[in-house]
């Protein structure tokens, strides 16, 4: 990968049902990082898509009375439409039923066969259709007369069939060595510890084909076998870069991937199986896997099977997309589970967006319109209050790149919204409305610094609330190519003589 390039992915979503808040959460996280990197002058490739093979899809299609591909065409379109409704900035949307993906999977399979890492044997063990995952005997318990996975709580069934196996056991020490040399491969650190403990407990060879289903990519020269959905699905991160065409610019520019954003429930596949497949194929693993927590309704994970889903589209229609994006990013701590509710959403909109940032923008723009004819000119005479605000802002912004590079999104947002709070306080303390008659120069300095603060805050919030941010930056008449993070290196955003346009209300308070 070239320097200052950034390849970020969401998990590709399993379209066995309608999208829910968990899908929205993963996608928005990835979009925020992608937008932030673009604002920091990185060349970004942002991928999302749908994972369309496997037994669960086959059964869902049968239930709907459709052929699997027809079913996938319908549901995948819903997920693709969701990217627009979530205001995602993805560069590609991949489907695992596309020819480019089949080509990549077949090539990777052949490499693993030739390297001796895949062999034919017989599988006997527990399998979860819901998880599309195999489980060991020690990972199974009986509950209410049914066998379930201790990992996910999903029901499992006993399976016996001929199967190709990947020699995962041969990669145990090599994976542990890889984790040791790449200490930030898995974040947060709690997830890293989980993975290391799992690998240290002993790895068994992994079944990577099925003969008991028909919907999937056929094993080359063994068409009675279908490639295991996870080996198939994970390869999407390569196929979007036209692998195996490794001499093309797209692949050379963006592999290895900078960041896989995933839910913690699929961490094992991304942090154990995926790097093992890649290392066996002599392909560099991704730089980072970030396993975020679950979005909870009360104390339970939101999922289709539990019927406790909050519909993101309903919330967008009722509250707005910027509002939902901000709330999800602010509410859920770094890598932890987060419980959401409409009440806490409304409180967040009121406290942070309407009363804080929105109020700051509105009061400054309105005052300049009514008292300065939308023009403000600063002088070099800074007051102690001006210097104090500038210093406090610099202290809050100096670690923002690091926070984002370590996926500390909620810490990032707390710092940014605190800058808005401090700027509101500065205006309250300095009272520019009292200076119009006797000290116009000081009034102008206060207003100009306030505009500079608003510009910085809006650029920093742009990855999270891009629609509102654009309205403010448009009204500040800041050129598109100047809406970047160069001010973190000491550059000004607002010219010494600022001309602004009118600004409508950004966020309405919810009563």
Pin down the residues of each PLM region.
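Short, charge-patterned binding micro-sites
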Residues: 50-56
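Feature captures the FAD/FMN-dependent oxidoreductase FAD-binding
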Residues: 97-117, 127-128
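Basic, alpha-helical terminal appendages of large translation-related enzymes
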Residues: 1-5, 19, 45, 49, ...
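A charged helix-plus-loop insertion that forms the helical arch/lid used to bind
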Residues: 60-73
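A glycine-rich helix N-cap at a beta->alpha junction
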Residues: 75-91
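Structured secondary-structure scaffolds
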Residues: 1-48, 100-104, 148-370, 412-416
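Active-site-proximal binding-pocket segments
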Residues: 267, 328-331, 335, 341, ...
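Short, cysteine/histidine-rich loop/knuckle motifs that typically chelate Zn2+
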Residues: 129-130, 151
């Amino acid at each position: 990968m070239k320097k200052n390039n950034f390849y970020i992915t969401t998990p590709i979503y399993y379209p066995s049902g309608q999208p829910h808040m968990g899908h929205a959460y993963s996608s928005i996280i990835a979009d925020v990082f992608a937008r932030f990197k673009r604002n920091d002058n990185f060349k970004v490739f942002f991928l999302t898509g749908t994972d369309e093979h496997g037994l669960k899809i086959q059964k869902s299609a049968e239930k709907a009375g459709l052929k699997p591909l027809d079913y996938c065409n319908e549901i995948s379109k819903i997920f693709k439409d969701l990217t627009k409704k979530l205001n995602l900035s993805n560069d590609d949307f991949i489907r695992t039923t596309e020819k480019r993906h089949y080509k990549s999977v077949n090539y990777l399979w052949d490499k693993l066969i030739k390297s001796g890492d895949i062999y034919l044997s017989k599988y006997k063990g527990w399998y979860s259709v819901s998880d599309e995952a195999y489980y060991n005997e020690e990972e199974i318990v009986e509950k209410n007369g049914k066998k379930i996975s201790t990992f996910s709580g999903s029901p499992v069934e006993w399976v016996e069939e001929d199967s190709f196996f990947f020699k995962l056991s041969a990669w145990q020490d090599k994976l542990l060595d890889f984790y040791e040399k790449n200490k930030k491969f898995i974040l947060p650190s709690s997830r890293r510890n989980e993975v290391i403990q799992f690998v240290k407990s002993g790895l068994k060879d992994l079944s990577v084909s099925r003969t008991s289903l028909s919907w999937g990519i056929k094993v080359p020269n063994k068409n009675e076998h279908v490639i295991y959905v996870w080996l198939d699905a994970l390869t999407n991160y390569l196929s979007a870069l036209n692998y195996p065409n490794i001499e093309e610019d797209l692949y050379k520019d963006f592999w290895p991937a900078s960041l896989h954003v995933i839910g913690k429930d699929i961490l094992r596949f991304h942090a154990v199986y995926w790097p093992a497949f890649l290392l066996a194929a002599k392909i560099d693993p991704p730089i980072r896997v970030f396993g975020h927590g679950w979005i909870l309704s009360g104390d339970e994970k939101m999922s289709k099977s539990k019927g406790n889903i909050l519909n993101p589209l309903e919330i967008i229609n009722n509250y707005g997309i910027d509002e939902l994006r901000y709330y999800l990013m602010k509410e859920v701590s770094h890598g932890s589970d987060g419980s959401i509710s409409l009440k806490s959403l409304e409180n967040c909109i009121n406290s942070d967006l309407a009363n804080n940032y929105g109020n700051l923008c509105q009061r400054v723009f309105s005052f300049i319109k009514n008292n300065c004819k939308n023009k403000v000119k600063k002088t070099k005479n800074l007051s102690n209050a001006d210097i104090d605000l500038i210093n406090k802002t610099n202290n809050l912004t100096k670690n923002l790149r690091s926070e984002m590079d370590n996926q500390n999104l909620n810490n990032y947002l707390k710092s940014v919204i605190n800058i808005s709070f401090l700027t509101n306080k500065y205006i309250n303390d300095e009272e520019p409305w009292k200076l119009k008659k006797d000290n116009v120069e000081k009034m102008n300095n206060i207003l100009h610094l306030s505009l500079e603060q608003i510009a910085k805050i809006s650029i920093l919030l742009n990855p999270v609330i891009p629609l509102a941010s654009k309205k403010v930056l448009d009204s500040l008449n800041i050129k598109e190519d100047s809406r970047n993070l160069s001010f973190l290196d000491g550059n000004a955003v607002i010219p010494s003589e600022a001309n602004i346009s009118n600004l409508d209300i950004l966020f309405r308070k919810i009563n």
